[in-house]
UniProtKB/Swiss-Prot annotation:
Compositional bias (Acidic residues): 348-359, 378-401
Keyword entries, A-Z: Activator, Apoptosis, DNA-binding, Nucleus, Transcription, Transcription regulation
Subcellular location: Nucleus
Region listing for Disordered, in residue ranges: 22-64, 348-407
BP terms from Gene Ontology: apoptotic process; positive regulation of apoptotic process; positive regulation of transcription by RNA polymerase II
One annotated Gene Ontology cellular component of this protein: nucleus
Keyword DNA-binding in record: yes
Pfam families documented for this protein: CSRNP_N (PF16019)
Expression across tissues: Detected only in the brain of 15 dpc, 18 dpc, newborn and P6 mice (at protein level).
Source domain of life: Eukaryota
Biased composition (Low complexity): 42-52
Name of the protein this chain belongs to: Cysteine/serine-rich nuclear protein 3
Skewed-composition ranges (Polar residues): 53-64, 361-376
Length: 597
């Protein structure tokens, strides 16, 4: 090994001779010239006396097999030519045709070899296929002509019997409009055709015994099952003697035995059409379910995508102010009088103040000062859960009350048509101490919106037809028709005792709702009703915790219809003239807009 590496080194250094792949000895462990060069370099470094690289001349390290396989895998296979071997035909004795004998085969040795390029081979295959297709179309044309002459075999014709394939010309067949590659397939050849091909190939004598053997094989394939009738004797039953089970696909086929009379030791198989039909239906249903599941998966993904896309925009809408206007706002005291819904301000801390303002503005109607969404209050979780439950109950009750009120309203609409006015409070009379906490209330004006015009009615008719019952909800007085059943107001009566944080109760009935929100300390104080027969029974409303000033107290008292003076004279420096001036400033320049209901 060392001497061989030394010789190679000398040959490489001289430059006269260079080792090639063909020169490598078969007994050499090297498999290529590149590996030999690597061995030379390793031997050269060992001979130089390098102490770092020890000598590898005493043993050989073969190249990695994995690396060699990887190098072979990177190469792509390219065919440059096609080699075709031709064999002569011989009698085969290997196939079983559907009829006759004289099977086709080939000799054990090829008689010629021919090479084609890829293009030449493709053209040659197309030519051969076209020739075979031409012969096939000629035979079809010949058969159609014979059937036409003999009238589908009912009439004998000498002319039809004398016709051959050679009588059919290429003009009679449409070969140009037929795709050869798509139409081409192997066709079975009849017995005469096979005999002619064998004689053309040089077969002088055709073995006739093959014909009898093929007939026996075909009969054995056609004959299946035993010949037993009703009963099977294991000693005479062919199925039992062959060691196979008796098979019954239908009545007496292929085996004629019955289930009770079969004595085959191997057993018995009976075709069950119900089981096959059930299996078929289950398979079809399973495939349909899988197809529906695949069709529903993209749809659900699209729905989730829409929900996720609209999710951020839907978030603030849940806390924004909803402007829900009832169908008719009817006032029983004075038909043409306007109702002023006050936008009060709360003196609470943080987000709780904003949410309570949201609830008061929602109950009192649509206010132009509540155009931006408010953040939810940081109340206790228990209170929020109670609020959600009560909201669901209130929505159900409101729907029922709305349906009942519409039915009751149909009998009184023609008798008591009243005007309705929707007032928007601008907050011009808001106290100066609240400008910092609610700055967006300070730049609006009081607007009166005429909802609809009706024929005024007398207070006596109104009180008789629409006797109301007072309901206090979070310090707000709700006027609802008396015709409703008292069971629907159970939850409303209970709300005066429970503390809610900014619950929204949509107005589902057409009654006027006057909301007087109160603070936590004054949550039990009710508002004054709009009807004179109830003002004597209820105390006057004090707005100490909301208006935070004596001017607003006098103004609210004036709106209630009496000249009630505050119980604290020391805290009320304003005179009656100033109160009247403040009242006139709030209601001056009304803007009336008719909204169809």
């Amino acid at each position: 090994m060392r001497s061989q590496g030394t010789c190679d080194n000398a040959a490489a250094m001289s430059g006269i001779l260079k080792r090639k792949f063909e020169d490598v000895d078969a007994s050499s462990p090297c498999s290529s010239a590149r590996e030999s060069d690597d061995e030379v370099s390793s031997s050269e470094s060992a001979d130089s006396g390098d102490s770092v690289n020890p000598s590898t001349s005493n043993h050989f390290t073969p190249s990695s097999i994995l690396k060699r396989e990887k190098r072979l895998r990177t190469k792509n296979v390219h065919f440059s030519c096609v080699t075709v071997y031709y064999f002569t035909r011989r009698q085969g004795f290997t196939s079983v045709p559907s009829q006759g004998g004289s099977t086709l085969g080939m000799s054990s040795r090829h008689n010629s070899v021919r090479q084609y390029t890829l293009g030449e081979f493709a053209r040659e295959q197309e030519r051969l296929h076209r020739e075979m297709l031409r012969e096939h179309l000629r035979e079809e044309k010949l058969n159609s002509l014979k059937l036409k002459m003999t009238k589908n075999g009912t009439v004998e014709s000498e002319e039809a019997s004398t016709l051959t394939v050679d009588d059919i010309s290429d003009d009679d067949i449409d070969l140009d409009n037929t795709e050869v590659d798509e139409y081409f397939f192997l066709q079975p050849l009849p017995t005469k055709k096979r005999r002619a091909l064998l004689r053309a190939s040089g077969v002088k004598k055709i073995d006739v015994d093959e014909k009898h053997e093929l007939r026996a094989i075909r009969l054995s394939r056609e004959d299946c099952g035993c010949d037993c009738r009703v009963f099977c004797d294991p000693e005479t039953c062919t199925c039992s003697l062959a060691g196979i089970k008796c098979q019954v696909d239908r009545m007496s086929f292929p085996c004629g035995c019955t289930k009770e009379g079969c004595s085959n030791t191997a057993g018995r198989i009976e075709f069950n059409p119900i089981r096959v039909r059930t299996h078929f239906l289950h398979t079809i249903m399973k495939l349909e379910l899988e197809k529906n599941r695949e069709q529903q998966t993209p749809t659900l993904n699209g729905c989730h995508g829409e929900i996720s896309a609209h999710g951020p925009s839907m978030g603030p809408v849940a806390h924004s102010v909803e402007y829900s206007i009832a169908d008719n706002f009817e006032i029983e005291t004075e038909p043409q009088a306007a109702v002023l819904h006050l936008q009060e301000e709360l003196d609470c801390q943080g987000d709780e103040e904003e949410e309570e303002e949201d609830g008061s503005s929602f109950c009192s109607g649509a206010t132009d000062s509540s155009t931006q969404s408010l953040a939810p209050s940081e109340s206790d979780e228990e209170e929020e859960e109670e609020e959600e439950e009560e909201e669901e109950e209130e929505e159900d009750d409101d729907d029922d009350k709305g349906d009942g009120f519409v039915e009751g309203l149909g009998a009184h609409t023609e008798v008591v048509p009243l005007p309705s006015v929707l007032c928007y409070s601008d907050g011009t009379a808001v106290h100066e101490s609240h400008t910092k906490n609610a700055s967006f209330y300070a730049s609006s004006s009081t607007l009166y919106y005429q909802i609809d015009s009706h024929i005024p009615g007398t207070p006596s008719q109104l009180s008789d037809n629409y006797s109301e019952r007072d309901t206090v909800k979070n310090g707000a007085l709700s006027l609802v028709p008396y015709a409703m059943t008292p069971e629907r107001f159970v939850d409303y009566a209970r709300q005066a005792e429970e503390a809610y944080g900014a619950s929204h109760y949509p107005a589902a009935n057409p009654s006027v709702i006057v909301c007087c929100p109160t603070s936590e300390n004054d949550s039990g104080v009710p508002c004054n009703p709009l009807y004179p027969e109830h003002r004597s029974n209820l105390p006057q409303v004090e707005f100490h915790s909301y208006l935070k000033g004596p001017a607003q107290e006098g103004f609210v008292s004036t709106l209630n219809g009496d000249s009630h003076i505050s119980e604290h004279p020391a805290e009320n420096p304003l005179s009656l003239a100033e109160k009247s001036r403040l009242h006139e400033e709030c209601i001056q320049s009304p803007v009336v807009e008719t909204v169809p209901v």
